[in-house]
Amino acid sequence: VLFRSPEETLYFANPGKEENFKPEFYFHWEDFNNTVIRDWRRIVSDLLSIPMAHQLIGYYTIADDKDKTLKVLRSYQYFAASKISDITHKTNWDTHQHRGGYVWHTTGSGKTMTSFKSAQLIANSGDADKVVFLLDRIELSVQSLDEYRGFAGEDEAIQDTQNTAILLSKLKSTDNDDRLIVTSIQKMSNIKAGKDISQDDIDRS
């Protein structure tokens, strides 16, 4: 849903019942540098054009099962997830010259949703065989797993890893349900390359 007044434009996902309309889910559309776009012509060209409008609705909304609310990504979340997915698609993994990257989000800015949407786009595109949410604290992995499962669609599985052996089995698995994995640095660090997992395992997964 998009609302336009002479002074500003707001967009939000339709929450259904009147009591579910909440101002915290009303967003301004901003450009890549987080500058609010107020000119209606820019709104039309940047947000309401085809295929952008279709992409925002089809790929950048999340039906959060935890609070039963349809949510749409804020503009900076959209740019982050879109950029990550695009770079992953363009990367030639056979050259082994790819680099890491990071997304800078502040507290309360929707990091979990951004990371989930990025992983979902990559997994659904087939550009990566595995997407691993690697977290630095075990308690954080439990919290994130709960949130990711709330974001996931009915046909998507978010895999937990209670121990290193289960993590190893998920990494080696060729099952499509094992593409999205949540685990901790501690469990990942227990896996020894060449001993627990071989290049053949990696090639098969």
PLM region spans:
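Conserved ATPase-coupling elements of RecA-like P-loop NTPase cores
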Residues: 191-195
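ATP-dependent helicase/translocase motor core
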Residues: 1-130, 139, 143-155, 180, ...
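Conserved residues at beta->alpha junctions
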Residues: 135
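Conserved helicase motor
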Residues: 138, 160-170, 184-190
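Conserved P-loop NTPase catalytic core
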Residues: 203-205
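Conserved motor-coupling elements within RecA-like helicase/translocase cores
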Residues: 164-181, 197-200
